[in-house]
């Protein structure tokens, strides 16, 4: 009777490394936008932890729940990158508020809006 070998442990990267590797693998212009989004999110919501969520960059709260994410247009063959917020994001505003944004370019104006949204979402 032969012994079954123990399953090999799965080697995983830490969240930050996994997110950076995923962004680095994106084609341009998604890669540049992803790098910029990552920097904005890290600067404005340092308490959120980067991780992969459905293979795309995401940022989770202390309970491990994804607050916000972005995905490249290539993921779903769309014409824009998406920045999205989950129910854990503190964006409630009356009875209706946006939870996803299409991004085709990042200028200083969009970066300022994103920074404010990220701060509010993580508050």
Positions of predicted regions on the chain:
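Charge-dense, helix-prone N-terminal extensions
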Residues: 1-123
């Amino acid at each position: 009777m032969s012994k079954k070998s123990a399953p090999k442990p799965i080697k995983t990267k830490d969240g930050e490394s996994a997110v950076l590797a995923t962004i680095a693998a994106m084609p341009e212009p998604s890669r540049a936008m992803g790098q910029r989004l990552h920097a904005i999110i890290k600067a404005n919501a340092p308490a959120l932890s980067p991780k992969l969520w459905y293979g795309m960059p995401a940022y989770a709260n202390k309970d491990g729940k994804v607050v916000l994410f972005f995905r490249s247009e290539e993921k779903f063959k769309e014409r824009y990158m998406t920045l999205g917020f989950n129910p854990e994001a503190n964006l409630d505003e009356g009875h209706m508020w946006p939870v996803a944004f299409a991004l085709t370019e990042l200028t200083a104006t969009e970066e300022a809006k994103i920074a404010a949204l990220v701060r509010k979402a993580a508050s």
